[in-house]
Amino acid sequence: MKLRTVAAAMLALALSAGAAAAQPAKSLRDQIVGTWNFVVAEVTAPDGKKSYPFGETPKGILIFTPDGRFAQIHVAGDVPKIASNNRLTGTPEEYAAIMRRSLSVFGTYAVDEEKKTVTYNIVSATFPNWEGEAQTRTIDKLTEDEFVNTNAGIAGGRGSASNFYKRVK
């Protein structure tokens, strides 16, 4: 009797493994949907020098919804607090430091499966010059846990910028 139970269990396992293998691979778009923690942004200058515009310990999040919307917040880990404790009464220096060390953007997105790119159609951003733009990033890595994308042509020919994320679990 035990032998039959073990044999039946092994057969069931083999069949379920075969069924799982027969399922089609998830599209890049399906894989990208979810919530991602921002790990770091790395800018590589044309001479190969690397810099980190949000520092090496930033905070942030990137959210892709199934219906094609995204929201992104990147903040340096060392953004100074406003001394007055009132966001409307900071000094020009405090506001400048915050603007240089943070970025929020939202809109819609599209994934090109063949080119392995994601295009952000920006509705609004804390850098208002981007509003209405479509910005395309190369998907360099996309696993269950990690997502890396690169903007190959950042403003002023300063090189490329890669953003690294880990999936929120």
Regions flagged by a language model, labelled:
Residues 1-5:
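Positively charged n-region of N-terminal signal peptides that target proteins for export
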Residues 8-10, 18-169:
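Lipid interaction determinants
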